[in-house]
């Protein structure tokens, strides 16, 4: 699908849309954010490969000036091309997922219209820093991905993505010995700042299926399926 464009102008971060009320039967929207190079696109690819035989899903990526992440997913044939689309955000990647989400909403509408019925849409943010989060008007739940390359201090530094995401993923754990990162420290500090919200430590090298993340996604899908059976606006499990 063709890329959707926005102007990328900065906006007041205090303004956000109300939390979206998912209508029964609508696809679950999961946001996947995190810094550049943390492994967001590789995680999206892994989830698509595991879920594509059991669910109807689609992917929306956000890149600053290119469609590189969407192109990567198409090249690796994780889903049919028509189920992958991109938003080009301009110079401020967090704007498109938090402050002015119009282009992302339009792209989601196009995916739903082109691929009915969808069960799940994965929305990948452009690479940003630890302050980037999704608008609650855009997604239902969000995953924030960091990796061990920044050292074991990253969870301790916090930030909205680390602290408040519905699932924190510490990626590339196989590299921890090479960079001197203590996974135990990362897990402990994440638990402290996240106050009960789950954290998953993964290595896509050692576990290409991203098993703990996959299990969490299935839990979210089960929660909305249960809500749909009762005909209520979904309450997503955290």
Curated annotation (Swiss-Prot):
Recorded source organism is Nocardia farcinica (strain IFM 10152)
Self-association state and partner proteins as the record states: Homodimer. UreD, UreF and UreG form a complex that acts as a GTP-hydrolysis-dependent molecular chaperone, activating the urease apoprotein by helping to assemble the nickel containing metallocenter of UreC. The UreE protein probably delivers the nickel.
Record localization? Cytoplasm
Q: Which Gene3D superfamilies match?
A: P-loop containing nucleotide triphosphate hydrolases
The opening ranks of the lineage are: Bacteria, Bacillati, Actinomycetota, Actinomycetes, Mycobacteriales
- Amino acid composition bias (Basic and acidic residues), ranges on this chain: 1-15
The free-text function statement in the UniProt record for this protein reads: Facilitates the functional incorporation of the urease nickel metallocenter. This process requires GTP hydrolysis, probably effectuated by UreG.
The answer to whether the entry has keyword S-adenosyl-L-methionine is no
Source gene?
Answer: ureG
Positions bound to GTP? 34-41
What is the name of this protein?
A: Urease accessory protein UreG
Query: Which CDD domains does the UniProt entry name for this protein?
Result: UreG (cd05540)
Q: Which NCBIfam families match?
A: ureG
The UniProt entry's sequence similarity note says: Belongs to the SIMIBI class G3E GTPase family. UreG subfamily.
Could you tell me which residues belong to the region Disordered?
1-27
Query: Which keywords are on file for this protein?
Result: Chaperone, Cytoplasm, GTP-binding, Nickel insertion, Nucleotide-binding
Quick one: a GO biological-process term for this protein? urea catabolic process
One GO molecular-function annotation for this sequence?
nickel cation binding
